[in-house]
């Protein structure tokens, strides 16, 4: 049986030490990240609150205190459809169910939202589009259940 070999590249460690220098350097660098990321996370949560909450119990989401993702839970059976609708509009999401083993969400209800890479303007636009797709997928599901 072979084991997993891990080996940090010393040159990368040296780069980090030279760049960050000490604990204060790490904290200062993380503060820069925070200043960039907090508005993006707030934009997503604001869009969800303003655009999804008035629609009733069609979605809920996490309010992370750190990390890179907001978990969005939509009506069961709708996550893949929401992701597909977003993709048709040019918005790429982390795959539906990606937080589950083998990407198999038994409820098909979870989307992992990562507002860390795009600009704030892009996050705001993407959040609005995502909300429209959640509403559309929900309406499609409800109409299919009534038929």
Spans of model-derived segments:
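PLP-dependent class I/II
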Residues: 1, 6-147
């Amino acid at each position: 049986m072979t084991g997993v070999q891990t080996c940090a590249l010393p040159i990368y460690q040296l780069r980090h030490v030279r760049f960050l220098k000490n604990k204060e350097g790490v904290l200062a660098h993380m503060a820069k990240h925070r200043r960039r990321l907090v508005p993006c996370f707030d934009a997503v949560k604001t869009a969800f609150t303003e655009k999804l909450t008035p629609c009733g119990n069609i979605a809920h989401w996490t309010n992370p205190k750190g990390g890179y993702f907001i978990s969005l839970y939509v009506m069961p059976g709708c996550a893949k459809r929401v992701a597909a609708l977003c993709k048709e509009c040019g918005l790429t999401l982390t795959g539906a169910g990606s937080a589950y083993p083998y990407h198999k969400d038994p409820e098909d209800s979870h989307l992992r939202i990562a507002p860390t890479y795009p600009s704030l303007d892009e996050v705001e636009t993407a959040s609005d589009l995502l909300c429209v797709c959640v509403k559309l997928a929900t309406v499609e599901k409800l109409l299919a259940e009534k038929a």
